[in-house]
Design a protein with these regions (language model features):
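Glycine-biased, low-complexity coil/linker segments
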Residues: 95-101
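N-terminal intrinsically disordered, cationic/polar leader segments
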Residues: 2-90, 103-152
Length: 152
């Protein structure tokens, strides 16, 4: 199954990611985003970081998740290659913290990769942020589909 594809968006860049589960679609969206930054074949899994994101909605969780990964790249130069989801809570039905708009959607993952090295890693796009513009996280037939636009 195709994991993701790049969307042609005027002035920005978009991504459509797929997965048999919503968790797999989130992982594939992150992999697709990293592939927009550099060629992942050159990235080695030398180091791991734990990345956590929360939101009150599944759409918001995706944006928070991708922006947290962008933060690690912008701040530490960390580019991920392997992603293992340790915890994924995609619903708003958690008691009691899920009541009253609390952040009840959550993802926690171990991301393996290394610091970006311009001598070894091809620089493609500088992604500023994942946006809510045309954002979509939905189940279609036998798979989950994600559409996300990145500010560049």
């Amino acid at each position: 199954m195709e994991k993701f594809r790049v969307l042609d968006v005027s002035g920005d860049v978009g991504l459509e990611a797929y997965g048999a589960t919503v968790t797999e679609a989130f992982v594939n969206a992150a992999a697709g985003m990293y592939s927009l930054i550099t060629n992942l074949e050159a990235v080695q899994e030398k180091k791991t970081v734990t990345v956590t994101a929360e939101s009150i909605s599944l759409d918001g969780l995706l944006v928070s998740w991708l922006n947290e990964l962008i933060f690690h790249f912008d701040t530490y130069g960390f580019i991920g290659k392997g992603i293992t989801v340790d915890e994924f809570t995609p619903s708003l039905t958690l008691p009691p913290e899920g009541v009253g708009g609390e952040k009840s959607c959550r993802i926690k993952a171990t991301v393996s990769g290394e610091e970006f090295d311009p001598g070894r890693h091809e620089g493609k796009l500088l992604i500023k942020a994942a946006t809510y513009h045309r954002l979509k996280v939905e189940k279609k037939a036998a798979r989950w589909e994600i559409n996300v636009i990145f500010d560049i």
